[in-house]
């Protein structure tokens, strides 16, 4: 997932909730991403109100896509270093993932995903199927991720891929058979949740045909 631009924090007010009142938000850290603390009163099952606090990490919103070559039954992955994974039990931090990225301010998810696909895996994809927009870690992160699928072939190849040089991205593009990718999930070689989710969607779609 490209981290090319600092995303705009989510400053808009939260929607109404009859079980939450006096919601106040303070910024704890405003660096590349934004860390905030929300304090609020939360209605308890007995009708009483309890003051609570939660911290939320704001990194903008993102998009991810699975590109499938239906003729050869292959998909495109990228391998990149993920420091947080390396700090939490992953042996070397080098994760295999589907191409993904953050949305620029005011940018729609489809436009962002097309850009990321060309930068990361080197394919210009005009037609993407939008599946869902999901919160991946709603207990601590504000980000939601929009999921896409599409097809690729030799005709869609437009450049080398591997990430944007001016953003110091260093990605290895990896093409694998769908069956092998699923075996890699079972062996613990693919441990990225968004990648597993879209692989499952592809496999289920093939079963239904």
Summary of predicted features, one role per range:
Residues 5-16, 49-52, 120-122, 126:
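Short, charged, low-hydrophobicity "junction" segments
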Residues 28-72, 86:
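Acidic, metal-coordinating catalytic segment for phosphate/diphosphate chemistry
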């Amino acid at each position: 997932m490209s981290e090319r631009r600092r995303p705009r924090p989510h400053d808009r007010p939260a929607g109404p909730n009859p079980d939450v009142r006096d919601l106040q938000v303070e910024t704890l850290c405003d660096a590349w991403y934004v860390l905030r603390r929300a304090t609020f009163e939360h209605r308890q099952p007995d009708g009483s109100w309890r003051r609570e606090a939660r911290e939320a990490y704001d990194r903008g919103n993102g998009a991810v896509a699975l590109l499938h070559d239906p003729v050869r039954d292959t998909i495109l992955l990228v391998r990149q270093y993920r420091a947080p994974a390396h700090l939490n039990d992953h042996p070397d931090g080098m994760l295999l993932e589907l191409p993904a990225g953050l949305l620029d301010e005011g940018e729609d998810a489809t436009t962002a995903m097309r850009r990321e696909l060309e930068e990361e895996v080197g394919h210009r994809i005009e037609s993407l199927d939008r599946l869902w927009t999901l919160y991946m870690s709603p207990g601590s992160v504000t980000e939601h991720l929009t999921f896409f699928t599409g097809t690729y072939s030799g005709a869609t190849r437009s450049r080398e891929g591997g990430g944007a040089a001016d953003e110091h991205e260093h990605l290895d593009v990896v093409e694998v058979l769908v069956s092998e990718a699923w075996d890699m999930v079972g062996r613990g070689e693919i441990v990225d949740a968004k990648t597993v989710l879209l692989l499952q969607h592809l496999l289920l779609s093939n079963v239904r045909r």
